[in-house]
């Protein structure tokens, strides 16, 4: 009975495979939205105010960071929790594949969330005159919460690595 349960639990990790594939579909959706934004901006580029262009560029950077986060979670999560990626020798392989454990992934995700939050906060500040003060305050508090969380996770990771 114990062997059956252990084998069933171990095999259940494959339930995550379609979830990671779903993230790749989300990446396709994000790429479509990215290029939709570019196509929307190009005809108006010469009539746009500089601040509006900067807001669009920040949105594009934001989408790029989210895309990188998706790729990192897809590949690292799959390798850590489902199976090793079998990439042929003659194909280009990302250097970090197979080297990022769950803790490293968690720290990278936290750093990415802080970067994404920073971009979002910058966009909000560029339009600060149209945003109520209490809403600005909450944006800053939420961002600082992300920063503090990422810092604490990194610090705790350093402590546990130092003690082992």
Curated annotation (Swiss-Prot):
GO terms for cellular component: plasma membrane. Its main location: membrane. The chain crosses the membrane at residues 10-32, 53-75, 136-155. Keywords: Cell membrane, Membrane, Transmembrane, Transmembrane helix. It is a multi-pass membrane protein. It comes from the Bacteria. It is found in: Cell membrane. InterPro entries: UPF0114 (IPR005134), UPF0114_bac (IPR020761). Belongs to the UPF0114 family. NCBIfam families: HI0507 (TIGR00645). This is UPF0114 protein YqhA.
């Amino acid at each position: 009975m114990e062997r059956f349960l252990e084998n069933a639990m171990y095999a259940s990790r494959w339930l995550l495979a379609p979830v990671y594939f779903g993230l790749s579909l989300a990446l396709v959706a994000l790429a479509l939205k990215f290029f939709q934004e570019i196509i929307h901006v190009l005809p108006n580029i010469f009539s746009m105010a500089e601040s509006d262009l900067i807001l669009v560029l920040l949105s594009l950077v934001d989408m790029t960071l989210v895309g990188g986060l998706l790729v990192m979670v897809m590949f690292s999560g799959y390798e850590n929790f489902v199976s090793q990626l079998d990439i042929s020798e003659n194909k280009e392989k990302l250097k970090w594949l197979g080297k990022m454990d769950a803790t490293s992934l968690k720290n990278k995700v936290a750093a990415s969330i802080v970067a994404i939050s920073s971009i979002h906060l910058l966009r909000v500040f560029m339009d600060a005159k149209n945003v109520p003060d209490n809403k600005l305050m909450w944006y800053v508090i939420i961002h600082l919460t992300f920063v503090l969380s990422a810092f604490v996770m990194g610090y705790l990771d350093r402590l546990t690595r130092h003690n082992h």
